[in-house]
Swiss-Prot record:
<feature type="region of interest" description="PABPN1-binding">
    <location>
        <begin position="223"/>
        <end position="237"/>
    </location>
</feature>
<dbReference type="GO" id="GO:0039657">
    <property type="term" value="P:symbiont-mediated suppression of host gene expression"/>
</dbReference>
<dbReference type="GO" id="GO:0005102">
    <property type="term" value="F:signaling receptor binding"/>
</dbReference>
<dbReference type="GO" id="GO:0039524">
    <property type="term" value="P:symbiont-mediated suppression of host mRNA processing"/>
</dbReference>
<keyword id="KW-1103">Inhibition of host pre-mRNA processing by virus</keyword>
<dbReference type="InterPro" id="IPR038064">
    <property type="entry name" value="NS1A_effect_dom-like_sf"/>
</dbReference>
<dbReference type="Pfam" id="PF00600">
    <property type="entry name" value="Flu_NS1"/>
</dbReference>
<keyword id="KW-0832">Ubl conjugation</keyword>
<keyword id="KW-1088">Inhibition of host RIG-I by virus</keyword>
<comment type="subunit">
    <text>Homodimer. Interacts with host TRIM25 (via coiled coil); this interaction specifically inhibits TRIM25 multimerization and TRIM25-mediated RIGI CARD ubiquitination. Interacts with human EIF2AK2/PKR, CPSF4, IVNS1ABP and PABPN1.</text>
</comment>
<keyword id="KW-1114">Inhibition of host interferon signaling pathway by virus</keyword>
<protein>
    <recommendedName>
        <fullName>Non-structural protein 1</fullName>
    </recommendedName>
</protein>
<feature type="short sequence motif" description="Nuclear export signal">
    <location>
        <begin position="137"/>
        <end position="146"/>
    </location>
</feature>
<dbReference type="InterPro" id="IPR004208">
    <property type="entry name" value="NS1"/>
</dbReference>
<keyword id="KW-0694">RNA-binding</keyword>
<feature type="short sequence motif" description="Nuclear localization signal">
    <location>
        <begin position="34"/>
        <end position="38"/>
    </location>
</feature>
<keyword id="KW-1090">Inhibition of host innate immune response by virus</keyword>
Length: 237
């Protein structure tokens, strides 16, 4: 096992512990608490994958951080902070929409890279909006926290979330997963739109029809899906 992988996990465990203390003292806002909960799941998955105990890793992580801080000068810290771009937290969803439990009548789940896609295949002929909470850096999507698909009535019918055991994903991972989710929902004649906020930070532009540009791979897949559906309809006739 790579030593850097282990030390990174140990430091992440300790930093999570520090952030938890901030929340316990009621100093964290809603986005801070949301990231804390999701990072907890990620750490559990990484700990299981690495075969490391989180409590023991936290203690070692504390020692690593204390050693770094002891050697770090105030001037170096100022320079580091000045040269590091700050990320922003973008919220399409309210806290209620973000934390609400939902159930699928005909569940389908697919893993696309480091992201998990869940779709309720029982949903048909609905107008659906995709909304997401995510962080942004340099005006581009950095990290997806959670994406959900909502009907006009407010029901949740689909979701994209990071896999706890596979930390880290790219903007292309997110766009590919969105393409898969759209294709799955449109299979049942649903009309899917993507929020302007998500379009702007993921694709760099927004369309009035709510449809982001598809990759060549997604276009080919949707064309195959359409041909298959036409053949199925002809057989039914």
């Amino acid at each position: 096992m790579d030593s850097n992988t282990v030390s990174s996990f140990q430091v992440d465990c300790f930093l999570w512990h520090v952030r938890k203390q901030v929340v316990d003292q009621e100093l964290g806002d809603a986005p801070f608490l949301d990231r804390l909960r999701r990072d907890q799941k990620s750490l559990r998955g990484r700990g299981s994958t690495l075969g490391l105990n989180i409590e023991a890793a936290t203690h070692v992580g504390k020692q690593i951080v204390e050693k770094i801080l002891k050697e770090e000068s105030d001037e170096a810290l100022k320079m580091t902070m000045a040269s590091t771009p700050a990320s922003r937290y973008i919220t399409d969803m309210t806290i209620e929409e973000l934390s609400r439990d939902w159930f699928m009548l005909m569940p389908k789940q697919k893993v696309e890279g480091p992201l998990c896609i869940r779709i309720d295949q029982a949903i048909m002929d609905k107008n659906i909006m995709l909304k997401a909470n995510f962080s942004v850096i340099f005006d581009r999507l950095e990290t997806l926290i959670l994406l959900r698909a909502f009907t006009e009535e407010g029901a949740i019918v689909g979701e994209i979330s990071p896999l706890p055991s596979f930390p880290g994903h790219t903007i292309e991972d997110v766009k590919n997963a969105i393409g898969v989710l759209i294709g799955g929902l449109e299979w049942n004649d649903n009309t899917v739109r993507v929020s302007k906020t998500l379009q702007r930070f993921a694709w760099g532009s927004s369309n009035e029809n709510g449809r982001p540009p598809l990759t060549p791979k997604q276009k080919r897949k949707m064309a195959r899906t359409a041909r298959s559906k036409v053949r199925r309809d002809k057989m039914a006739d």
